[in-house]
Amino acid sequence: MSFFSELVSTIFERRYQKVLLKETEGKTTVELADALLGSIGEVSGVTLARSILDRYAIMSSNEKLDFFEFMTDKLEIDPEYVIKTLDAFKINPNKATYQAFAEASEPKRQELARRLNQVPGATAQLVKLRKDLLGMVKDRPKLGPLDVDLKHLFASWFNRGFLVLRPINWSSPADILEKIIAYEAVHAIHSWDDLRLRLKPTDRRCFGFFHPSMPDEPLIFVEVALTKGIPNSIQELLADERDPINAADADTAVFYSISNCQAGLAGISFGNSLIKQVASDLATDLPGLSTFVTLSPIPGLNRWLETSKLANENLGQDEALAAHYLLKAKKPDGMPLDPVARFHLGNGAKVHAVHAQADTSENGVEQSNGTMVNYLYDLSQISQNHEKFVGERIVVASAPVKTLSASVKIKV
């Protein structure tokens, strides 16, 4: 198409969109959604989608609930028709019968979400929409199927192939830096000076995953300290008066904070890919790095101690209790009770060391008496560790941690 043809087409589309927008003014949001599902033309579809998203953005909580209930109840599958098409496929499995079954099995709300996503910037709006939904679904279980469908779509839209790994440093745009301050979920960043100490020194790194449809919104980011040796205290790692080292002199990369940024992407895992990609990139850029570890919180430790059947003589043995908790406290499915442990062990890390008085902040003391843990990412053992953990529920740990755990006395 020539430049002139494109220009004429663009002018026509804009004028047509104005006409269509005027036509939407007298219709309800539900009517617009039905029209969008029945639309064929690209221009009309984009106009309808934009109108729906613009309306959603100014809805009250009750209006959003009404919209969610419409998507859940009115755009549901027809179970009887699904069974009918499945029976037809069983009798005569071919392309046509399978396609009929596949179409019957997909709720119309998935197609509505896809069509809404035609609008530039719609992906971020749909992520916010799911955030709103998650705030309601706990008290309204019938909205659960809508969440399942949105999560299914997001898992595809946000798969690793679409994500872009970007370094975040003191020279990054101010709006990105503001979001790092706001989204930091592990060790609060209290000021711009605090942020500068995390990003500017030569022995500090930060990386985030971004999506092309949300270029100014980090999805997840990890903060990294380059050190000599494995640290045993977050206070020392983040001390204001510490002396930075040259990155080339470091032998250890410490992942000390991982923050998910988008509540609407809950349940979509990015951390596994992020840590492995960052570790690989750092190993390439800094050949002197030989050790990759975390310095992680143990958020469930104190809650577990309140209900566990441990002998009184264990009191004060913070490192032993933490080791025992990480290795032995399990959910009914055999997975570790601690969510951070499940994450890192599922990634193929192992429990390397535990440290008392490692986080003396109010939050650190409240959740684990200040105890923290190093998870070691041995790049040559990640796959084997992952298989042991996922397949056999084996928590891979160092000998010192196993010894500490075994020293804990149980009530009889």
Where are the language model's segments positioned?
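Extended, composition-driven regions rather than compact fold-specific motifs
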Residues: 1-412
